[in-house]
Amino acid sequence: MSDSITPHNPPSSHTHPMASSGCKPLHGNLPQLDGLDICIHCGMCLPACPTYLATGSEAESPRGRLYLMKKWIQDELEESEIKPHLDQCLACHSCETACPSGVQYGRLLMETRASMAPHRKGFARSLKRFIFNHILPNDALLRVSGFLLWLYQRSGIQALVHRLGLLKVIPALATQEALLPKIPNNKALKAGMTFGPANGSPVTLLIGCVMDVFYNPIHWDTITVLAANGYRVSIPERTCCGALAHHAGEIDITERLGWQTVEALLAPKPDWVVINSAGCGSSIKEYSHLLKPQSEEQSRQLAELSEKVLDVTELLAKKPLAPFHHAVPMKVAYHAACHLYHVQKVQKQPTELLAQVPGIELVPLESADMCCGSAGIYNLEHPDLSEEILAEKMQHVRQACTVGQANVLTTGNPGCLLQLTHGVESAKLDMQVLHPISILAKGYKQT
């Protein structure tokens, strides 16, 4: 069987002799950005960068953005001259996989965004901070939001809105509405619930915010698979990990939500902390760099979480899967979510697990690790460029569907699930879009 992941650019890395150098800022309040001078401008990142491929602009490439960062902190460019180019970066980290010099582009980008965030004014930033602070971490408000979306879709209101063409008045709103998945009405998961064998290895499952509202069934599928493989699953207090706030450069919110998440995930005293959302997992795995302990206890907690946190496919790949109850006849193409493949370096485990399911045939997807254009809320903030990047991805998906006869497209991140479902529906392809854990769960569920 051929490998189901065909990287668009084979990874390569070595340490450059300038690795310890930094770019000294002339602005007193700007970051040192250690490692900025490591870039040797070789251009290996260019064919790996979705925004460069879409625009052909050097300023929309990792190399170009690093140059702009350097000029900005040396007071040779105004913030307004570089901000649009940094905002258009997907933060997919694909350039880091391609870079032969080991440039930590993602860290440099986030530090620069964070230093700019306090200077930003206006309604857009205030609205995002309100959502990050008061909606995403709030269990009650999230459940109400989910119910209202469910009611909008199931009551006939959505059909009426479409029939009257009301969304055409606000094209941006129409784009956002098109991305909404069908909101599930599954039984809610609540803190303190436990599942699986009483003597099983204890694990905590992050419920999160957006993941639980849009994709609650994936949590139940995760519980099914973990329980079948001998794990005792505990549901912690709901928290938002702060990933979206981090991407927006709102470090104060990121830290506050981060510490809440650390305490919630460790409270059940698990052997492992399990994440089934690539974006959340990459954020939590970066807590050791993002969060600043204020006590010995916080330092201990941070070290403990760093040792225990795993993507669900990482944990399951530690040993052969338990026997399945029945076959799952599917031809599956796998899209490697950026924050799983490029940030967490979880690259082989998802397809290795899928290959163990009787009935599954893996279909190669060209450029499987190239970004789909979702990138958190990027597809809402930059819909045109996001659609262009998605169109490139969908060419490869269409080939896997029509030539390889794939009838399922799978990926391990909610943003990618939203984006690719939108792409598949727009292209009118006869494919389901599923999380890998949902495919595994089909083999364990009693029918």
Task: List each language-model region with its residue ranges.
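Iron-sulfur cluster-binding electron-transfer modules in prokaryotic oxidoreductases
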Residues: 3, 105-447
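N-terminal glycine-rich anion-binding loops that anchor highly charged ligand groups
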Residues: 43-47, 57-61, 233-234
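Short secondary-structure transition/capping motifs
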Residues: 58, 78, 88, 94-97, ...
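Non-heme iron-sulfur electron-transfer modules
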Residues: 2-28, 52-84, 102-130, 430-439
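Generic, well-ordered alpha-helical segments
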Residues: 61, 78-81, 87-91, 100, ...
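N-terminal, well-ordered alpha-helical segments
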Residues: 47, 67-71, 80, 84-87, ...
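Cysteine-centered iron-sulfur cluster-binding motifs in ferredoxin-type domains/subunits
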Residues: 33-52, 83-103, 339, 369
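Short, intrinsically disordered, charge-biased short linear motifs at domain edges
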Residues: 24-36, 75-86, 226-229, 357-362
